[in-house]
């Protein structure tokens, strides 16, 4: 009966985010950069009935070599950022194996899951999910490809690259609630791939969510949420940026200070949205940890 209710909710749930996210309405950080100064280091604290999630496109380590934006120069800012933000779970996009290894070893208190998109092992970018072991227990997880053959490494429709989604089911220890988390990265070139990839993700959420658990979806969607590709997701989930009573209007893609596009989003179902935040702070003197800012949301478990 729960499963039937979950499927029916696709068609009857009200769309929570009707406002258009026109980039002209969004602003970059001060002088086109992140916040002034170095951030405080005291970890953020949330209530026992809340979950904090972060989505972060880390920018692949194979790009920007021999520049001031090279991975080896900016990676030092990432562990203190996560220590300060203190998320329950977080998803990363574009992470190569060396970046996954860095996060596993340097972000204390978290374990990470995910596979390389090129071979289902370690080759190519990983849509990784990390979880705070003191707060959540991993129940099960998997990866599927955004293509017509989702169970094998493959490229779908008009996509330029292989694209994957990593999903996991967690038990939240403080509240006892089980929830599902999906992290992905839609194609930057193929519009059909973005549309059909998101439809596939919706269908997989229904398939894998056997307990009708609350759901979180994070990604670099390479689209603003007024794009019609989101119509199917808006019938199932809520956009944290527009629904949370505490939010901001900063762009998430900074393009190393040259852009303010709003393409990184957090969607949820079965939670109450508390706050949304674009993380623009400076750590260890690194102005840009990536060409994307991390985005975070605090979600409250429904009674």
Residue ranges and their predicted role:
Residues 65-69, 155-156, 192-195:
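Short, solvent-exposed loop/turn segments at secondary-structure boundaries
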Residues 18-106, 119-125, 199, 302-303:
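N-terminal, active-site-proximal structural segment of metallo-dependent hydrolase catalytic domains
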Residues 45-49, 83-84, 105-106, 120-123, ...:
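Extracellular/periplasmic catalytic domains that process cell-envelope and extracellular macromolecules
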Residues 51-58, 78-103, 130, 168, ...:
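Active-site beta-strand/loop signature of hydrolases that rely on acidic residues for catalysis
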Residues 58-62, 95-99, 117-121, 135-136, ...:
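Solvent-exposed loop/turn segments at secondary-structure junctions
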Residues 45, 89, 93-178, 278-279:
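Structured beta-strand-rich core segments of catalytic domains in phosphoester-bond hydrolases
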Residues 29, 37, 192, 196, ...:
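Metal-dependent phosphoester-hydrolase catalytic domains
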Residues 1-15:
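Sec-dependent bacterial lipoprotein signal peptides
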């Amino acid at each position: 009966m729960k499963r039937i209710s979950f499927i029916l909710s696709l068609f009857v749930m009200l769309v929570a985010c009707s406002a258009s996210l026109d980039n002209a309405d969004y602003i970059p950080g001060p002088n086109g950069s992140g916040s002034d100064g170095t951030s405080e280091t005291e970890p953020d604290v949330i209530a026992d009935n809340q979950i904090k999630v972060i989505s972060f496109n880390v920018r692949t380590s194979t790009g920007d070599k021999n520049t001031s934006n090279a991975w080896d120069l900016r990676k030092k800012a990432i562990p203190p950022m996560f220590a300060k933000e203190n998320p329950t779970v977080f998803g990363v996009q574009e992470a190569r194996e060396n970046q996954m290894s860095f996060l596993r070893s340097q972000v204390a208190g978290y374990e990470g899951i995910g596979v390389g998109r090129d071979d289902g092992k370690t080759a190519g970018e990983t849509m990784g999910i990390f979880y705070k072991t003191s707060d959540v227990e991993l129940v099960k997880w998997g990866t599927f490809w955004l293509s017509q053959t989702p169970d094998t490494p493959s490229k779908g429709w008009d996509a330029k690259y292989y694209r994957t989604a990593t999903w996991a089911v967690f038990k939240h220890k403080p509240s006892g609630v089980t929830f599902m988390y999906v992290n992905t990265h839609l194609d930057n070139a193929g519009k059909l791939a973005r549309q059909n990839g998101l439809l596939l993700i919706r269908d997989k959420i229904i398939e894998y969510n056997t307990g009708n658990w609350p759901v979180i979806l994070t990604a670099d969607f390479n689209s603003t949420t007024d794009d019609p590709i989101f119509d199917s997701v808006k019938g199932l989930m809520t956009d944290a940026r527009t629904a949370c009573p505490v939010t901001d209007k900063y762009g998430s893609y900074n393009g190393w200070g040259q852009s303010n596009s709003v393409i990184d989003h957090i969607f949820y179902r079965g939670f109450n949205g508390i706050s949304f935040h674009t993380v623009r702070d400076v750590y260890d003197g690194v102005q840009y940890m990536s060409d994307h800012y991390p985005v975070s949301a605090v979600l409250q478990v429904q009674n």
